[in-house]
UniProtKB/Swiss-Prot annotation:
It comes from Sinorhizobium fredii (strain NBRC 101917 / NGR234). This is NADPH-dependent 7-cyano-7-deazaguanine reductase. It is an enzyme of class 1 (oxidoreductase). GO terms for cellular component: cytoplasm. Pathway: tRNA modification; tRNA-queuosine biosynthesis. The gene is queF. Pfam families: QueF (PF14489).
Length: 154
């Protein structure tokens, strides 16, 4: 089994300050090492935070990202820092969700990617945002994202 080349990574294994914005955040990638094999990678961020662009109040979401690599994997520490960079970023739920997905697609050029963002209610209305690049490759196992529909107290 070949060892993954991590020589080009700038954040893994070092102390890194949190980026102040998504634009400042550096996403990094590593070779998958499994060319020709379709598999699904899932990242779950159950405590994602951003700010409402109108009120500055915090917004919270449970985000699930699934993708089928085509040669590249996102380096998980850089993804964590990228997602954390939204903490002080003002944007609507839809913008945060789609921007995250498009940034990953730009970095990785995956065979397929989907994101589900399950935003916690503000003003009594939950907003769920879903985006994907197209149909997944045939034959890959795609488990349910596992986030229950918001039911309130009823």
């Amino acid at each position: 089994m070949p060892k993954t080349d991590v020589s080009g990574l700038s954040q893994l294994g070092t102390k890194v300050d949190l980026p102040q914005s998504p634009e400042e955040a550096v996403l990094e990638r590593v070779p998958s090492g499994h060319e020709g094999t379709d598999f699904v990678v899932r990242f779950t961020a159950p405590e994602f935070t951003s700010l409402c662009p109108m009120t500055g109040q915090p917004d919270f979401a449970h985000i699930v990202i699934d993708y089928v690599p085509d040669g590249w994997l996102v380096e998980s520490k850089s993804l964590k820092l990228f997602l954390h960079s939204f903490r002080n970023h003002g944007a609507f739920h839809e913008d945060c969700t789609v921007d995250i997905a498009k940034r990953l697609v730009s970095l990785l050029s995956p065979k397929w990617l989907r994101i589900g963002a399950y935003w916690y209610p503000r003003g009594g209305i939950p907003i769920d945002v879903f985006w994907q690049t197209g149909n997944p490759p045939e034959g890959v196992w795609l488990p349910d994202q596992g986030v229950p529909t918001y039911r309130g107290r009823g």
